[in-house]
């Protein structure tokens, strides 16, 4: 049996990773300075570095929280190299490449999971295939932080 993921743990991990994600999204032109500012510490130190373990924890917990809150097997969410889950009710996928896949970078996922950005804002920067992938937008953010 898989243990239930705590929303507190997800918020804590996202809060730790938010400055890093905000700085990366700002650098990529996907986030305005005004939106990024509350997430990036004044000295900028936290925005420039984050341990791989902390990044992995934030990504894994938040993606798994999505799967917990939107159970199912019709859409696969991938955030390489850290995690891939199936979620959203619907036809079950069992072999080969799933028909509905969304794949994105860790910083984009963390921005979506924490409410910094919306799926519509970054749609051109993520790989989406299938008719049901946009349904993950109905379950975002996973945990709003500010």
Listing of model-derived features with the role each one plays in the protein:
Residues 79, 86-101:
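Mature extracellular/passenger domains of Gram-negative fimbrial/pilin and adhesin proteins
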Residues 66, 83, 132-134:
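Residues that cap or initiate secondary-structure elements
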Residues 70-72, 80, 121:
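A generic structural signal for short, non-catalytic loop/turn and secondary-structure boundary residues
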């Amino acid at each position: 049996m898989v243990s239930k993921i705590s929303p507190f743990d997800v918020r804590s991990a996202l809060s730790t990773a938010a400055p890093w994600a905000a700085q990366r999204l700002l650098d990529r032109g996907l986030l305005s300075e005004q939106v990024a500012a509350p997430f990036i510490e004044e000295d900028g130190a936290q925005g420039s570095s984050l341990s791989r373990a902390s990044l992995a924890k934030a990504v894994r917990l938040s993606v798994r929280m999505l799967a917990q809150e939107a159970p199912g097997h019709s859409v696969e969410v991938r955030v390489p190299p850290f995690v891939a889950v199936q979620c959203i009710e619907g036809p079950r996928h069992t072999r080969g490449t799933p028909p509905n896949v969304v794949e994105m970078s860790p910083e984009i996922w963390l921005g979506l999971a924490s409410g910094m950005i919306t799926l519509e804002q970054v749609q051109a920067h993520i790989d989406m295939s299938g008719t049901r992938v946009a349904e993950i937008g109905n379950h975002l953010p996973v945990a709003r932080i500010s």
